[in-house]
Amino acid sequence: MARIAGVDLPRDKRVEVALTYVYGIGRSRAAETLANTGVNPDTRVYQLTEEELVKLREWIDANYKVEGDLRREVAADIRRKIEIGCYQGIRHRRGLPVRGQRTQTNARTRKGKKKTVAGKKKAGRK
């Protein structure tokens, strides 16, 4: 089983797709990595030679921040924004959307399950 950056890549997938299992590598970075290392994107993971795997590992380690390092950096960036009290930090602290999305309706992913708030009672008919 091929391991890159501490992640087991699925054996039967194409290398281009399998690399996207690593946090911090998407389709475009995977394609760039394969182009720079000279590995054919259509190759299946189980067909990779040890030499190609070493090339991929070295290229990724040298050029990209992935997995734990990237997660730590993102978490540190969010913590910093919360500490300095900027608008984005306040939105993170309150658990609301950070990038300007509307919140009167929608935003359920960030806000969580609906909490019903008591509203005005309608006046009865006389």
Swiss-Prot record:
Annotated region (Disordered) at 95-126
Q: Which Pfam families match?
A: Ribosomal_S13
**Compositionally biased intervals (Basic residues):** 108-126
Give a GO molecular function annotation for the protein. Answer: rRNA binding
Matching entries from InterPro entries are given as: Rbsml_uS13_C, Ribosomal_uS13, Ribosomal_uS13-like_H2TH, Ribosomal_uS13_bac-type, Ribosomal_uS13_CS
Q: Does the keyword tRNA-binding apply?
A: yes
Q: Give GO terms for biological process.
A: translation
PROSITE patterns for the chain = RIBOSOMAL_S13_1, RIBOSOMAL_S13_2
Q: Name one GO cellular component term.
A: small ribosomal subunit
Q: How does it assemble?
A: Part of the 30S ribosomal subunit. Forms a loose heterodimer with protein S19. Forms two bridges to the 50S subunit in the 70S ribosome.
NCBIfam families, sorted: uS13_bact (TIGR03631)
What is the recorded name of this protein?
Small ribosomal subunit protein uS13
Gene name per UniProt: rpsM
